[in-house]
């Protein structure tokens, strides 16, 4: 039986995280934003400490570095059980880093990395229960993976169509970029390990803030991805996330920004091609775009890191760039990517990290 605080928390801000609630009650003005953050803070304080979606929604509402104070205040007041929750740790670390508090963020990430490594060791110790069991689980995993890919492509087609309808009404064309363009050109499909869609827009076509274009729509939820760039993520009602990267001209090149890096391309125009059965804009010379972004893109490389490996990358925020290596290490441990794990450990050692890395 739920106690009173659990019921209040669930009714106050678990249902808000349902897509339809987020659209009907999402903040559009500064006063609404402050009120929304205060509502989430209250929901966490009365018992929602381990409800990770609350923490992530709070972080997604941050509009300036000063908003980190709410997250920090909650973190300092949180119980021990909350401080061992990997998703909460990652959310708080992200809030710290996007606010420029990198030392705080890295301290939290070190703890998260050690916890994740310990959990992974325990999971592996349970795995060795006989070859037949392991083989069976791997087969089931592959079947589920194929089913998930088919489902994602179906939802992605709908999400991309609806996105284009919205933006074309404002004279804005979306075009495939990054991993989505790579999958289209090389494989004729979405890359199997991609979990979202990447599109670009020309900044000169965006006469209005992209967030504002989606704020009143019932089938999309929109959030800025960080405080240092204009890129946004729109989440379709199907659950598909689409990252939108404005491409702007500077120094005779087209650039688009990430959190701590940016990438250049030779200026290009657009052409339409069939993607997932629908017409979609792509760079007029997609192979050149991919050459500049990936180098040898014709051979699949699951361990490619666009911040480290892209031939056209430029670091714009060294502190944040270094912090992202901690996030990357945490992700590789959770996903059991051994090759990349050792790569990020080596990079952290170059940054001066020593003793604690031996524990992972």
Which functions belong to the PLM regions below?
Residues 164-197, 204:
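Active-site nucleotide-donor binding segment shared across nucleotidyl transfer reactions
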Residues 83-94, 98, 102, 106-176:
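Helical scaffold of the NTase/Pol beta-like nucleotidyltransferase catalytic core
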Residues 47, 78-82, 115-119, 351:
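Alpha-helical junction/boundary sensor with strong preference for TPR arrays
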Residues 148-164, 168, 214-281, 288, ...:
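Conserved catalytic core of two-metal-ion nucleotidyltransferases
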Residues 26, 60-61, 94-95, 331:
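Residue-level signature for tetratricopeptide repeat
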Residues 49-79:
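Alpha-helical adaptor scaffolds
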Residues 23, 55-58, 92:
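Structural register within alpha-helical repeat arrays
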């Amino acid at each position: 039986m739920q106690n009173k605080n659990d019921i209040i928390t669930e009714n106050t801000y678990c249902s808000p995280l349902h897509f339809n609630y987020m659209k009907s009650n999402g903040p559009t003005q500064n006063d609404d934003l402050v009120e929304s953050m205060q509502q989430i803070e209250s929901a966490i304080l009365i018992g929602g400490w381990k409800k990770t979606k609350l923490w992530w929604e709070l972080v997604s509402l941050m509009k300036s570095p000063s908003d980190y104070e709410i997250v920090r205040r909650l973190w300092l007041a949180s119980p021990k059980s909350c401080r061992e929750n990997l998703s909460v740790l990652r959310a708080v670390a992200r809030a710290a880093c996007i606010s420029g508090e990198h030392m705080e963020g890295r301290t939290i990430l070190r703890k998260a990395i050690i916890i994740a490594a310990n959990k992974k060791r325990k999971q592996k110790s349970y795995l060795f229960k006989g070859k037949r069991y392991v083989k069976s689980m791997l087969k089931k995993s592959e079947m589920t993976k194929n089913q998930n890919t088919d489902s994602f492509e179906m939802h992605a087609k709908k999400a991309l169509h609806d996105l284009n309808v919205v933006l074309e009404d404002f004279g804005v064309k979306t075009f495939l970029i990054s991993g989505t363009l790579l999958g289209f050109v090389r494989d004729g499909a979405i890359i199997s390990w991609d979990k979202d869609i990447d599109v670009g827009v020309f900044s000169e076509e965006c006469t209005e803030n992209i967030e504002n274009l989606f704020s009143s729509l019932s089938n999309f939820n929109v959030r800025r991805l960080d405080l240092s760039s204009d890129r946004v993520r729109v989440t379709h009602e199907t659950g598909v996330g689409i990252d939108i990267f404005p491409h702007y001209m500077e120094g005779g090149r087209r650039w688009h920004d990430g959190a701590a890096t940016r990438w250049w391309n030779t200026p290009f125009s657009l052409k339409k091609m069939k993607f997932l059965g629908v017409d979609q804009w792509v760079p007029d010379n997609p192979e050149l775009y991919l050459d500049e972004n990936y180098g040898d893109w014709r051979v699949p490389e699951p361990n490619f890191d666009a911040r480290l490996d892209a031939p056209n990358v430029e670091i714009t925020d060294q502190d944040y760039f270094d912090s992202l290596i901690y996030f990357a290490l945490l992700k590789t441990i959770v996903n059991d990517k051994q090759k990349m794990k050792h790569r990020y450990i080596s990079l952290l050692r170059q940054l001066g990290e020593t003793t604690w890395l031996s524990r992972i």
